[in-house]
Each structure stands twice: as structure tokens, then as C-alpha cells.
Amino acid sequence: MKEGAPRVPPGALARCFGRSLFLQAAWNRRGMQNLGFAYAIFPALSALYADKAVRREALARHLGFFNCHPYAAAAILGGTIHHEEKVAAGLEPPGAPVAYKATLQGPLAAIGDGFFWTALRPLFGALAAVGTLLFGWPALVLTLTIYNAIHLVLRIGFFRTGYRRGDDVVGVIARLSLPAMAERLRLAGAGVCGAAAALVAARADQVPRSGALYAAALVAALGYCALARGAPLFLAAYAAVAVGVGLALLTHLFGSPL
Amino acid sequence: MKLLALGLVAGFAAVERKGFLQAMLSRPIALGAMAGLVAGDLDAGLTVAVPLELLWLGAVNLGAALPVHEALGTVAIAGGAALAAEVLRAGGAGGPALLPAAAAAAVVLCAPLALLGRRAERLVERWNERLYARAEHDLALGDDEAAARVNLYGIALPFAISFLLAPLGALVSATAIPLFLERVPGALPPLALGLVTLSAFSCAAGAKAMRAARAKLVYFAGLLAGLGLFAATVLAGGGP
């Protein structure tokens, strides 16, 4: 960047990041996260473009379609501010930030959905569930704290890297090998769910109904098979409750079947 | 007062799950505990939080797909279970089966709210298109600050929907469950076992939601290892 080129001050950058936490506040089918993105980047545009007409034009280009994973979008927000600084300095055409967003939103959405939504968060959900079963609410608080430490460090890191490195953010995120890590986290999550099922069954032994342990273990096994064969989740859940109620009634009427 | 507090928790969760932050505070495991706490019974909240978290582990926003509204369902269920158990205890009921039975009944009654919430979210998305039009209008008028601020108005409707529906669900539970269980006290143990089998099924649903190629193998390995460990503990005289 040339000497004296306009830069977004740190305070405005912090406001942009803070506003990015509202990225999906007005999610809509036409522009998806467009309103959230325009809201998030506005402090940077205000800092870069003193001329109201130019600023309006800049905001208008960020009201176009945008959709990404909300955590990973922080990288695009940072990178877009990087490009807006170049536009303000006359080093790039006004279309450059929009092209940057269009190029990155798909790949980063795939990485974010695959890592955070279908791996990290479900794993921590399962860990929190098992921890709560074993140790009560302190385990829940601890699990959520660890998850959010990871989440916020990555989210802030994405934003900073995007802002500092611009287009190079892709390489930085690629080096994290998030898709490979996601697969391992998903497997760990499945294992934790299996352990949770065993724990539920073991605790069922305390229910004053003989056979509760076997019923729980059987439902945990058959439930997976039913879902794998395409059983609808809601109906299967109601069926699971009905199995427990029915078994208890049968036990009451005819004695323990197991 | 408790219903109002449940409404506020549900409203906050509805915003947190999509519109702001997304720090797992609106996941059933956290939200069930919070709803139980504000309804005066943390145990009731935790009793439903664990199975609901695992049941809805796969409820995530992927692209434009809408999952069930697990937050709305969770507050209604946890609040309903806590309030129903309170009414039952006040009526002289007790025993270890009371809370699990109330929880199972609350799940049966209020889980459909999660589906209703998904429908409501579709309406919210359509409503937000009007906000988009409003932002364009503000910008055309030259008010760029107002155009940027429009985004925040999107928080109001999800908050309002959950603020109204979740306490309503809890109220229905708190009314219907004690009425039923006071007339049919023999239903307590069967419903308690119903919660156990639901919890076991939820673990299966959680593993299935992991979307990993070898998830089945690892899930069953975890299940068998856990049961084996339990059997070994019992055989060694350690008890469950």
C-alpha cells in the first residue's frame, strides 16, 4: 500500500468484527446474508469514504447477494475491508471487493459448514451431554467455555488474517487442514454418542423396572439402524418413547419379559 | 413471572441460534439448563437437555436449509417439565419417577413446537425480504446509515415468535401433565422408562447426525465398550 493511503483505524475494525456477529440477523432468501454483511462493513466504509455519495455507492455494492458460514465469513469480511482500502487508495477498481466476496464465499462456506457445523459443534454437544450425565452442570459450563474459546479464537483469527493478507487468506485457511480434522472429529463424536448410549443404559438400571438396561441398549442399537434405513427422526423418537412406555406396561401386567 | 422469564430465554435463544453470535448458548444442552433454572428446577432442565441435545445434534443451518427450531422446542419442553413437576410436587406427588415422567410427557407434548418453529422461520425469511427492500429504499433516499441499520430489525420477529410460543407450550405442559398424572398415577413409571428409551434413541440420532463414513462402526464400538465397562464394574462389585 502506498504511503498515506487511507486505512481503516483499529477501532473501526473492531466495530466491524463486533457487527459481524449479527451477520445473519436479517437472513433472507433473496440476498441471504447481504444485510448482515452491509451492516458489518459499514464502519470501515465510513472510515474510508468521507464523501457521502462514494460511501453510498460502496454500501450499495455490499447489499448484493452474500452467503457463507457465519464464522468463516469473518475472513471474507476482513479481506473485503483489505480490498476496500485499495479501492479507496485508487489501486483497485470498485468491483474488486465484490469479486473477492463472490470467489471466496462458496469454498469458505463449505469449509465452515463441514468443520464447525457438522463436526466441532456436534462433538462438543455430545461431550457436553456426556459430561452433564456424569458430572452435572459444571461439565456443561466447562465444555461450552472450551468450545467458545476455540470458536472465538478462530473467528477473530480469520478476520485478522483476512484483513492483513487479503487474497492469501485462502492459503492460510487451507494450511489448517480443517476438512481432514473434521472427519476425525465426526468419528470421535460418533464414539462419544456410543459411550453416551452405554451410560444411559447403565443408568437405566437404576429405574425400578427390570429390563430397563436391556431396553435402553436395544433401542440405542435398533434406533441407529432405523435411522440409517431412513426412518423419520420425529416419528422414530415418538416410537422410542412408546417402546419404553409399552415395555413398562407389559412388565406391570405380565412380569418382567427380560 | 416464570413464564415471562421462559419467554425471554426463548426469545434470546431464537436470536442467538441464527441472528447473533452462535456460541452454542441456544443449543438444547445449554438452553435446557437455562430454561430449567429460570423455571426454578435446574434438574428438570438438565433431565431434558441431554436427550434433546443428542436428538437434535444434526439440527444445523446448512446453506439455505432450515432445520427444526430446536431452541423453541427445548425451552417449551424444559420449562413445561419443570413447571409440571412443581405442580405435581405441590399436590403431594413424589418419588424418583416423577421428574423423568414429567419430562417424557413434556417431550411428547411440546416437541412438535420445534416443527412449528421451522415453519415460522420460513415466514421470518420472507419478512426479512421486506427489510432488504427497505434497506434499498433507504439507500436510494441517501440515508446509508439507516440502510446499514436495517439488519438489526431482523432480530425482532424471531424473538417475538419464540417469546410467545415457548411459554405457551410450557403452560400447556404445566396444565395437562399434572391433570393426567394425578388421574393416572400408574403412568409415572412407564413414562419414566419412556424417557430412558428416548434418551437411548437420542444417542443413536446423535451418532447418525455425525455424517462420518465409519460413524456406525465407531458408535457401536463406543456402545459395546461402555456396556462392557459397566458390566465389569458391576461384576467387580462397584455397582452402577
Tell where the protein language model's regions lie, with residue ranges.
Chain A
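Structural signature of hydrophobic alpha-helical transmembrane segments
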Residues: 141, 200-216
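Alpha-helical transmembrane segments
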Residues: 138-152
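Interfacial loop-to-transmembrane junctions
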Residues: 220-244
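Transmembrane alpha-helical segments and their cytosolic interface motifs
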Residues: 99-132
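Juxtamembrane inter-helical linkers in multi-pass membrane proteins
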Residues: 96-98, 161-177
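Soluble N-terminal domains of membrane-associated systems
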Residues: 1-93
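Alpha-helical transmembrane segments of helical membrane proteins, especially in multi-pass transport
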Residues: 154-158, 175-206
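Juxtamembrane boundary at the C-terminal end of a transmembrane helix
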Residues: 245-258
